[in-house]
Amino acid sequence: MHSKKSIQGSETVEQVSIEAPGSSSPQSNHNSSSDDEQDVQDDISQSDSDSLDSQASRKRRKTSQVLEDGDIPLIATTSVPSRVKAKSQNNLLEPKNFNNGAVLAPTDAQTTFAALDVKPWLVASLGAMAIKRPTGIQKGCIPEILKGRDCIGGSRTGSGKTVAFAVPILQKWAEDPFGIFALVLTPTRELALQIYEQFKAISSPQSLKAVLITGGSDMRPQATALAQRPHVVIATPGRLADHIRTSGEDTVCALRRVRMVVLDEADRLLASGSVGSMLPDVEECLSLLPPPSERQTLLFTATVTPEVRALKDMPRTLGKPPVFVCEVDTQALAIPSSLNQMHLQVPVTHREHYLHMFLLTEKNLPKSIVIFCNRTATADYLTHLLRLLEHRVTALHSKLPQRQRIDNLGRFRASAARILVATDVAARGLDIPEVGLVINYDVPRDPDDYIHRVGRTARAGRKGEAVTFVGQRDVQLILAIEKRVGRQMEAWTEEGVNLETRVIRESLKLVGEKKREAMLEIEEGREVGGKRKRGMKKLS
C-alpha cells in the first residue's frame, strides 16, 4: 500500500485509496417524526412523476384512453435525442476526479482478519457469519481505527463498511466495557435497524447492550433504555435530537462519555443548504458528546463529498493521531463492473403500461426487482396499481408506519413479494440479497442517488441489471448520470420482445381500468389490498 502525505499546519494527513482486485489501472479521477430524511423532499420535489401528475386529477385530464378491442392506435414513443441511443458497453467516459491526488494501491487478496490485529473471538464471530476475509475498505480502516485514528472511509455500496467500523468498535469496547461507549448516527430507520442487527450478530460471544433509537416508536421505552447506559447507541439524528431536547438529564448524561462516534452515510448526514437537511439535528447530537479531541470520529460513505473531507482539516489536539482517509473504488469504480446499465424510452402518458409489460417479459419475470420513485405518492400509487395487476408487490417509503415498513422489507427479503416499490429511503446501505433488477421509474435528480439506487443489485460480485425509464424531460439528467459514473447506458433490448407492440396489444385497456381502481382506492383511503385505513372515512 502506498500513501501520499500532505502537511495540514503542524499535522500530517494521510490519504490512501485502494484499487479493488481485478480493477484496471488507476484513472484520474427536525424532529423525530421525520427520521427518514431521505424522503423529506418528496412532497415538495420539482421532479414529480409525470405519469402520476398527469393522472392524479381526473377533473383536469382523463386517466387513460380506454379503447375497444381492435381500435388500437399507434402510440408515438418519446422522441429522445440520438445522444442516448445504444452505446457500446465498453465506451467509457472520463469520470470526475474526486480523489484529490490520493494514491491507488493494490491489496493482498489473501489478507485475513487476524492479520489486521482483530481479536480471535471477533475473527470466530465473523467466520460464523460467513465473513472469512476482509474487503478493501476493511483492510484499510480496521488497523488504523484500532490505533485510535479518526477515519474517513469511502467505498461503494455493498463493500462491507458496517463491518469496517463495527469490528474495531467492538474490540476496543471489549477492552473497557462501559456505557455509552459508541454512538452510530445514520439517515434512515431501516439502515439503523440493519446496523443494530449487525452489531448484535458480531458481538454475540459477548454481552453487548445495544439500543435502537429511531422514529416511529414510542419515545418512553427509548428514554428508559438510554438511561440504563447501553454500550452502543444506533440512532437516526432526528429522534436522538428529540431525546436531547425533551428527555431528562438521566437519559442523555451518558452521551457525554462517548468514546467513539460514527456517521454512516456521512455525505447525507452532513449535506447542508437543502430542504430537509439533517445537519442541524446532527450538530445538536454531536454538541452533547465529548469534544473531537476527546473522542474518535469515524465517517463512512459511498460518496466522499467536500463536507466529509472537511473532517481532516478540523483543529486537532497536539499528540492526537492524524486523520486517516481511505477511499476504495469510490469514484472510478462507483458502479460495479458486473452491473449492466440500460435505459428504456417511454412515453410520459403510458409509463405504467410499459412498466407492467416490462415486468412480464420472459427474462424479467423470475427476477427480484426494486422499483425506485422520487415521491412517496408515486410509490404508493404504483403499489396499488401493480397489486391490482396481480404482481406480488410491497412498498417501502416514509409514509408507512414503522411496523409495516419492517414487515414489508421482511416479505421482500423472504421472496414473499417479488417487487419492492420504494423511494430513496431504500437506496442507501440496505443489504437486500439477490436483487436481480433495479428499475428507476423516475430518474433521480442527483447522480449520486442513482449510484446508491443501482447499488441494490450486483452486490458482492453478483451480476445485476439497472434500467432507467427515460422521458423527454429526462435527457439532461441521464447525461449528468453518465458523466458522474463514467459510463454510458445502453438501450434496453430483449430478444424477441417488442415492448411497444405488447403494450398496444395487451395492456392499454387493462392497465387503464386498473389505474382508475388504484386512484379510487387511494382517494378512499384504502390500504393496498382494499381494506380501509384505520381512522379513514370513505370520501363522499
Curated annotation (Swiss-Prot):
Coiled coil: none
Binding site for ATP: 155-162
Protein's cellular compartments: Nucleus, Nucleolus
GO CC terms: nucleolus; nucleus
EC code(s) of this entry: 3.6.4.13
Cross-referenced SMART domains: DEXDc, HELICc
One GO MF term attached to the UniProt entry: RNA helicase activity
Reactions performed catalytically: ATP + H2O = ADP + phosphate + H(+)
Function comment: ATP-binding RNA helicase involved in 40S ribosomal subunit biogenesis and is required for the normal formation of 18S rRNAs through pre-rRNA processing at A0, A1 and A2 sites. Required for vegetative growth.
Protein name: ATP-dependent RNA helicase dbp8
